[in-house]
Design a protein with these regions (language model features):
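Short, hydrophobic alpha-helical packing/hinge segments within bilobed ligand-binding/sensory domains
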Residues: 46-49, 65, 101, 114
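Sec-exported extracytoplasmic/periplasmic mature domains
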Residues: 8-13, 34-35, 51, 55, ...
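Mature extracytoplasmic/periplasmic domains
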Residues: 92-150
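Extracytoplasmic ligand-binding site segments that recognize negatively charged/polar headgroups
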Residues: 1-54
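Solvent-exposed loop/turn segments at secondary-structure junctions
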Residues: 1-3, 62-66, 82-84, 96, ...
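Extracellular/periplasmic bilobal clamshell ligand-binding domains
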Residues: 134-175
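A ligand-binding cleft/hinge motif common to bilobed small-molecule-binding domains
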Residues: 57-74
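Periplasmic-binding protein-like
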Residues: 27-32, 69-95, 130-131
């Protein structure tokens, strides 16, 4: 999720009317900038493209922007129409180390760990008790405080349509 929604937003589709995704319209909009797009294949590459100014702006994970800023690179984050997506921690059924994995998840999602993680990475905590342990100035900079124009990716839609969107996406990239 992300690029298709961004293309539709750029083409004037209101955030509350994104789904179902109009793929024809999205790819038509992407066609207008295709020759100027630099695709990155990992978070570190997105940072390098911005740090070197090879890419003057981009759609980047906010934690990578935090790391750039913490390293002294002159970057700023625009939260206008920021697109959020869900993530999950899972333990596969039949895991040999299920107990250790569950202990890790409990520790990693504890209020203290999530507050520390937010400070280090710039990612918002998932534990609702974490913000009261955080510096209020830090909390103001995190993604969950940037909701005025936030766009939530419809993860159910993506789960149901991922294969079809993926086929269309890869065909578009290849041409």
């Amino acid at each position: 999720p992300g690029v298709i929604e961004a293309a539709l937003l750029a083409d004037g589709v209101p955030a509350d009317k994104l789904y179902p995704l109009d793929l024809d319209r999205a790819f038509k909009k992407l066609d207008t900038i295709k020759s100027d797009i630099i695709w990155w294949s990992g978070g570190a590459q997105s940072q390098q493209l911005l740090a070197s100014a090879e890419a003057p702006f981009g759609s980047v994970w906010n934690g990578r922007m935090t790391a750039l800023a913490q390293s002294g690179i002159n970057v700023e984050t625009s939260w206008e129409q920021n697109i959020t997506a869900a993530d999950a921690l899972v333990v596969p059924k039949g895991s040999k180390n299920k107990e250790a994995a569950m202990q890790f998840i409990a520790l990693a999602t504890s209020p203290e760990a999530q507050a520390d993680l937010a400070k280090i990475t710039g990612y918002a905590p998932i534990n609702l008790d974490s913000p009261k342990m955080m510096d209020p100035e830090l909390a103001k900079t995190l993604p969950d405080a940037q909701t005025a124009s936030q766009v939530n990716a419809d993860m159910n839609y993506w789960a149901e349509n991922r294969d079809a969107i993926g086929e269309r996406w890869y065909a578009w990239q290849a041409k």
